[in-house]
Amino acid sequence: MASFAASQTCFLTTNPTCLKPNSPQKSSTFLPFSAPLSSSSSFPGCGLVHVASNKKNRASFVVTNAVRELEGYVTKAQSFRFAIVVARFNEFVTRRLMEGALDTFKKYSVNEDIDVVWVPGAYELGVTAQALGKSGKYHAIVCLGAVVKGDTSHYDAVVNSASSGVLSAGLNSGVPCVFGVLTCDNMDQAINRAGGKAGNKGAESALTAIEMASLFEHHLKA
């Protein structure tokens, strides 16, 4: 009988023992190649051993109570209060972002509980959002701005500082702070993302704020 190669694979059901061709064990049963295989392990001198598992014993977290899915909703936002921090730099663009955010809030019945705070530029978004968050008046804060790339490295410094500032504001205040700052190569890209053919980043940020406010209020509230 031809000898097995050193890397010959053994298929077992119960006893993970390498079966030799010249001394077969009648008590062991080979699994057909079509049998379901759910796990594998290695044994010395036996190569890769596949062990079949009973489907009935497989834990399914999808159909048990072991896993809960938590998420925010945008259907009921009447009770939430929001703040919008808007950078005045590139106001032609940022005002459109603000209008998109306000329109979205109105669509979801957030009509009066909105404060709009203007700051000089994207640098000032983070510290302002943090102060608003710590005031305890708001369920979420939207930060809007537009940074257009120029010929110097100033663009990278502003973008990095603005993004990290808004992130820190949310972490330090415990209130969701949404980053709605456009970072574009040119003004045309910014305009297209402020109500043009690429949508409105302000509207998207407002929707994110509603969902996050709902998530924190209904699931993550201390």
UniProtKB/Swiss-Prot annotation:
It comes from the Eukaryota. Its EC number is 2.5.1.78. GO terms for cellular component: chloroplast; cytoplasm; riboflavin synthase complex. (2S)-2-hydroxy-3-oxobutyl phosphate binds at D151, T152, R193. Its main location: plastid. It catalyses: (2S)-2-hydroxy-3-oxobutyl phosphate + 5-amino-6-(D-ribitylamino)uracil = 6,7-dimethyl-8-(1-D-ribityl)lumazine + phosphate + 2 H2O + H(+). GO terms for molecular function: 6,7-dimethyl-8-ribityllumazine synthase activity. The keyword Cell membrane does not apply. SUPFAM superfamilies: Lumazine synthase (SSF52121). Pfam families: DMRL_synthase. Pathway: Cofactor biosynthesis; riboflavin biosynthesis; riboflavin from 2-hydroxy-3-oxobutyl phosphate and 5-amino-6-(D-ribitylamino)uracil: step 1/2. GO terms for biological process: riboflavin biosynthetic process. It is found in: Plastid, Chloroplast. Residues 1-66 form a transit peptide. It is an enzyme of class 2 (transferase). The active site is at H154. Gene3D superfamilies: Lumazine/riboflavin synthase. Keywords: Chloroplast, Plastid, Riboflavin biosynthesis, Transferase, Transit peptide. Signal peptide: none annotated. 5-amino-6-(D-ribitylamino)uracil binds at F89, A122, Y123, E124, A146, V147, V148, F179. Oligomer forming an icosahedral capsid. Catalyzes the formation of 6,7-dimethyl-8-ribityllumazine by condensation of 5-amino-6-(D-ribitylamino)uracil with 3,4-dihydroxy-2-butanone 4-phosphate. This is the penultimate step in the biosynthesis of riboflavin. NCBIfam families: lumazine-synth. Belongs to the DMRL synthase family. This is 6,7-dimethyl-8-ribityllumazine synthase, chloroplastic.
